[in-house]
């Protein structure tokens, strides 16, 4: 939801509008949003890492019939879940760049994931280690690299400062009042995917088939 357009749809108009009036005020607003996003994502990922078995039960209850499959799902999910943290923060910096009419870096950043995944397969063959584990670590690494790349390009226009002291003013409240409806509307697609995964988890290989079908569906959306 945050990484695939919902956040940008709410943030860019607010930030760009503030930027047109006063850059300092716009940057203060962006810093508050960044710190809130950082804290929320960090807590969410940390809780998910701790309670991953329970999370897998909610997402794919059918895996509980096979202890070996369940353990693999939990282990791999714990490895790949930090990707969510990195990619959402990367999306934030992509929104900053878009607000300055700089689109190339944000548009090209997803290529990093493909390059890292392909490279990890060559590495796993060369090092004679598990393809599955290598790809899982590669996903989180790719998310981290996307964040670093977009931060590098955005730093000329915006420099984030991490702090836990965040004043929730009217602008922040207004921003989240616009973000919540976007989350609910965009969440319909995610709920469909979740329901499909829950049902598919009871059939061997069905989750993979569902994922491949979704990839085909996403082709026309780039």
State where each predicted segment sits.
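Membrane-embedded alpha-helical bundles of multi-pass transporters/translocases
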Residues: 1-222
